[in-house]
Regions:
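Transmembrane alpha-helix segments characteristic
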Residues: 5, 104, 179-183, 257-281
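Specific aromatic-rich, kink-prone transmembrane helix
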Residues: 33, 82, 103, 122-146, ...
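Short acidic/glycine- and proline-prone juxtamembrane loop motifs at membrane-interface regions
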Residues: 44, 112-122, 287-288
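Transmembrane-helix motifs of polytopic, lipid-linked glycan transferases
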Residues: 70-92, 125, 129, 249-255
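Hydrophobic/aromatic-rich transmembrane helices and adjacent perimembrane loops
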Residues: 120, 152, 158, 244, ...
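Perimembrane helix-loop-helix junctions
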Residues: 158-185, 254-257
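Membrane-lumen/periplasm interface segments of multi-pass, membrane-embedded glycan/lipid transferases
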Residues: 196-254, 277-280
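Membrane-embedded, lumen/periplasm-facing catalytic core of multi-pass transferases
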Residues: 314-382
Length: 442
């Protein structure tokens, strides 16, 4: 029954239109046809295994955008069964299969990852698979999946810490564990080397510095981003998230007090805490998908608290939440906003999807990061696209704001502010926009 539900879920997501809604997804699509980190095809660190997967799919579909989205969908469709199997193995309770499976499937994060066109879903599947293989003592498979995790999404190196520790702790099997990791790593290094050579490492240093100091929006560089994380936790995990975090932190004490037969070492809780700190200080709170690792592992660990009589209650709740997540297929907010902007705007100022909008629309697009250029474009009648409501002080005239709702709660929505000026001679908005466009072109 769970397998049939999983197939229905997969079929539902396949009905959504293929659409790239971020610069990162566009970069991956470019990488399908030409790989170069220096050309942002894709951006650093290159994600070699994800490029291999998308190129393999592209042999069948001959459409880079579709190949990228299907690769994300394929990996994300494995998250629910792998998380459920890991919970069953860790807690030695087969009855946890249905509640964990349904709960992960019902998370707004799961379809968001599936349709993102990014490497998060496949990398998380490799991560859960490596942890599960270690519990089953399939050491070589665990090493292979861990190597693929790092090749799919090298920025997930923090996720590799626990499986690496557990694998190296296995006496007599370390070579079988390390060899696949080394082979995948060497193959990945040769792949990026043949494209960019030594310049790859220079780009890596530049990109990493920029992520943590300038445009990455991380709390490591901007302490106020921790408040943004609090809002993101509220939106994605309900305001009860402090209780959930507290429960995870006291998990080792609970196991000891109950003499749980399948008690986990405190290392698992410590590992989850490390992932939490890495998320808070190294990731962007504007992208809720960065909560996926701690959310998935948190569900697996908290499953042990679930009383046996409550398992089917959680399963039914998961089904109900899955019904709430269901929505009719439609393009993402970025695509909808771009279509309206092309009809109503002479130009556009935004900090989101700048490269995507420049390549997929005919509009002049100004990067909002450059304040002077943005102010000049806005003074000439450009529209403003933002993930936050646009204050009147940000615009040089009265505007009409349009809200584009996300398809899922973990996707970003967008605001588009369109100037509604009248010229002194009573000309229409359309004529004024045409005049503003002519001035900008000149």
């Amino acid at each position: 029954m769970l397998a049939l539900l999983q197939l229905a879920w997969l079929g539902w997501l396949l009905t959504f239109p293929v659409a790239l809604d971020s610069d990162d997804a566009l970069n991956f699509a470019h990488g399908v046809t030409r790989f170069s980190v220096l050309e942002f095809s894709p951006h650093f660190p290159g994600y070699p295994a994800f490029i291999w997967l998308t190129r393999l799919i592209n042999l069948a579909v001959d459409d880079p955008a579709r190949a990228v989205q299907w690769a994300s969908l394929l990996g994300s469709s494995l998250l629910a069964p792998l998380a459920a199997l890991l919970a069953v193995k860790l807690w030695q309770r087969p009855s946890l299969l249905a509640p964990v499976w349904l709960l992960v499937l019902a998370l707004p994060l799961t379809p968001t990852l599936a349709l993102s066109g990014l490497s998060d879903g496949p990398a998380l599947a490799a991560w859960l698979g490596s942890l599960l293989a270690l519990q089953q003592r399939r050491i070589a498979l665990a090493g292979l999946l861990l190597g693929l995790l790092l090749a799919l999404r090298p920025s997930y190196f923090v996720l590799a810490l626990l499986p690496l520790w557990l694998g190296l702790a296995q006496d007599g099997t370390r070579v079988r564990f390390v060899l696949p990791i080394a082979l995948v790593g060497l193959t990945s290094l040769l792949f990026v080397w043949q494209a960019d050579g030594w310049a790859y490492f220079s780009e890596g240093r530049r990109f990493t510095d920029g992520h943590f100091t300038l445009w990455g929006n991380t709390a490591a560089a901007h302490g106020d981003r921790l408040l943004s994380w609090a809002r993101t936790f509220d939106d994605q995990l309900t305001p009860l998230w402090p209780l959930l975090i507290g429960a995870l932190l006291v998990l080792p004490l609970w196991q000891r007090s109950k003499n749980h037969p399948a008690a986990l070492p405190p290392l698992w809780t410590l590992y989850w805490l490390v992932l939490l700190l890495w998320t808070l200080f190294g990731q962007n709170p504007d992208n809720p998908r960065h909560l996926a690792p701690i959310t998935l592992l948190g569900i697996v660990l908290l499953a042990g608290w679930l009383p046996r009589r409550g398992e089917w209650v959680v399963a039914v709740a998961g089904l109900l939440l899955l019904g709430v997540t269901f929505t009719l297929p439609r393009p993402p907010a970025m695509v909808q906003a771009a279509k309206l902007a092309e009809k109503a705007c002479p130009a556009l100022v935004t900090q989101w999807g700048v490269r995507l909008l420049r390549e997929t629309t005919a509009l002049p697009v100004t990067d909002g990061w450059y304040k002077g250029d943005a102010a000049l474009a806005l003074s000439q009648g450009a529209c403003r696209l933002s993930r936050r409501p646009i204050a009147a002080s940000e615009m040089s005239t009265v505007v009409r704001q349009h809200w584009f709702a996300p398809r899922f709660a973990a996707e970003p929505g967008l605001w588009l502010a369109i100037p509604s000026l009248q010229t002194p001679h009573g000309e229409s908005d359309k004529k004024h926009r045409k005049s503003a466009k002519n001035r900008q072109d000149n």
